[in-house]
């Protein structure tokens, strides 16, 4: 691996520590290198705070090291717009371009700074895919997650699903929540299962809990309401939701987002993109998974298969309108399967274009 790729891979791994913490901004990582030596590193850790390259250069100076003449490796081109932060283009850069603006190269060149894009571009695109999706098509990147039996059931015919997955798998899946901006659930799951959708450990960051409810309803004594102080709750509702329901949710400090047709996943996706979400995990039942699969909204899947059979349980989804195997949606593995007790965990993604080169994997926490 070339030196450039080595340092960029370090920046990418650093950026994974910011997953779920910086939306609507991407969680960028940066390292400062001079004469083959690491001088400093930094990341955009929280929305509204310093950007990655600012923190990396500050790390150099805090150690009494002069970054003059160094190369800054960033996972996304530096910001050149005034917003929460001033322009931060004061160092050499090699990175993926920022889709929000294209003047970075000109500004850097005018300042006498060499600029190069494309080092580990595919990995940077994969890491920042949610942000890139929101900028390009107006919606977040969605990951569908479910636990199922060996014969593809989410639950028994009586809707019992506790627990298909092993305890190690449950703990792993809950830890994974923290790398997303939000967790999406349907109203049926919210009523029947009454999940808290919190992360695995006390004090650990939990994303925004998002419930799709056309009538803006949550169960009386809901765990989501009871745990509101631990993480925000957002209810996506229809434009004609009863005023009393909206008032009741507001009284519990529940955030509200109206869409014209909450049963249309494409409208929901656009609304959540406008809200600022980059990466969303969908945890729900057959109805919501079927709707998102039919709409082609899932970019990734995280599947947990428990070693049980039900024979006639509730299927993962239905109504995809597929008549032949060739018409089915195809996926490719994103890393090897993992054995978690009596459960196999598998991460999938939409297939890459034919001929796309394999690159070193980014280590994602979780």
Positions of PLM-derived features:
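Enzymes that bind and transform nitrogen-containing heteroaromatic metabolites
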Residues: 1-26, 60, 141-143, 148-366
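A broad detector of the eukaryotic-type serine/threonine protein kinase catalytic domain
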Residues: 16, 43, 94-97, 113, ...
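Contiguous mid-protein beta-loop-alpha structural module that forms a pocket-lining wall or clamp
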Residues: 97-151, 167
